Regions:
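A conserved short beta-strand
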Residues: 30-42
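C-terminal catalytic histidine-bearing segment of alpha/beta-hydrolase fold enzymes
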Residues: 63, 69, 85-149
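Conserved alpha/beta-hydrolase "acid-adjacent" motif
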Residues: 69-76
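Short, proline-enriched alpha-helix->beta-strand connector loops that line the catalytic pocket
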Residues: 54-60
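Glycine-rich nucleophile elbow surrounding the catalytic serine of serine-hydrolase chemistry
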Residues: 13-23
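Gly/Ser-rich "nucleophile elbow"/oxyanion-hole loop immediately N-terminal to the catalytic nucleophile
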Residues: 1-15, 31
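Residue-level signal for short, function-critical loop segments
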Residues: 15, 41, 66-68
């Protein structure tokens, strides 16, 4: 048999998966121990104060690139994060990158500099476990969360 520790269910997704991450949180706020929405397009103006209050106690780590031309951070993740903080969220984090560049050393542009990807591809940093805040890494942080609700 397969056993799932229901106190350690983490949800995350990139782009539309980030939208679905937020939707799952809004609809099931007591189910998840942590969440990591990446370049999520759940436009903040469609998020009510009641929705913010419903999810403010869920540990969350947002990731985005400022130059994302697909999902504009100024109308999506940034105001949502600010509203969560204002509502009293205690365990929220955000990794903000100016752009998305290759960090593997494998891909270079014509000038030999790290290749710059589309700014929407900030999941590259997430999936390479390069999202950090004060020595804390996203996946170590997420794995340490336990849902006692």
């Amino acid at each position: 048999p397969i056993y799932i520790d229901e106190s350690k269910i983490i949800v995350g997704g990139c782009s539309n998966g980030g939208f679905m991450t937020m939707r799952l949180l809004f609809n099931n706020p007591k189910y998840f121990s942590a969440a990591y929405p990446v370049c999520e397009p759940y436009t903040d103006k469609f998020i009510t104060d009641e929705m913010i209050n419903r999810i403010k106690d869920i540990p969350m780590w947002f990731t985005l690139a400022i130059n994302d031309s697909v999902v504009e951070p100024m109308i999506n993740e940034l105001p949502t994060f600010q509203r969560l903080a204002k509502a009293g969220a205690k365990d929220i984090h955000m990794s903000v990158f100016s752009n998305v560049k290759d960090t593997s050393g494998l891909y270079k542009d014509a000038n030999g500099q790290p290749y710059e990807y589309n700014g929407h591809w900030s999941w590259i940093y997430t999936l390479n476990n390069e999202c950090q805040e004060n020595g804390l890494q996203l996946f170590e942080w997420a794995g340490s969360k336990v849902n006692n609700k």
